[in-house]
Amino acid sequence: KYLPIKYEHVVFCHLSPFQLALYNLFLRSPAIARLLRGNGSQPLKAIGILKKLCNHPDLLSLPDDLEGSEELFPEGYKPGDRRHVAVELSGKLSVLTRFLASIRSNTDDKIVLISNYTQTLDLFERLCRLRRWGFFRLDGTMNINKRQKLVDRFNDPTAPEFIFLLSSKAGGCGLNLIGANRLVLFDPDWNPASDQQALARVWRDGQK
């Protein structure tokens, strides 16, 4: 009863034209046809491809993951290019980027960005570096001692870093990110309990 009111919003984002073209290509592929006939043996792999595609096409190994996808590439598109982030190729990332820019320009808020995929966190990290947005990152590769130091720095209200990148697997019990008053769950986990654990990192005792 001592916590502020929590507002949850589900934001629906349109696929970019490139995402939509790749999505339809995959649905028409022989692999999906086999799955629909009950002959396919890798339904989880297919779902994983669609989940990554909905985050950003750069998370896929193109054209290997989607045969024939090279015919759909926008002019100048280079799969695997790690020097920049093509924000416009992802509906979700386009919305998120505008949201982060608004927070940076108009508020003193801090935000936690959560994803199941370290590849997506890599994408966020490149975006932050290119936009010169201060951030911290915590994933499963970081040891316990460094984690707490990172959390303490982020929770310091005078710290200039306003973004905290967090893998959902690392966002379990005991992690207290009350320095943030906003959180974006970029993609859901298979287990809803994992999502709830991650969401609880912000809305907890000490939150203003």
What is each PLM-predicted segment?
Residues 2-19, 27, 37-163, 167-171:
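Conserved Helicase C-terminal RecA-like lobe
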Residues 170, 189-190:
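Flexible, active-site-proximal loop/turn residues at the rims of small-molecule/cofactor binding pockets
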Residues 175-188:
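A short beta-strand element within the Helicase C-terminal
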Residues 191-208:
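Conserved SF2 helicase motif VI
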Residues 3, 177-178, 207:
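Short, conserved loop/helix-junction motifs that constitute active-site signature segments
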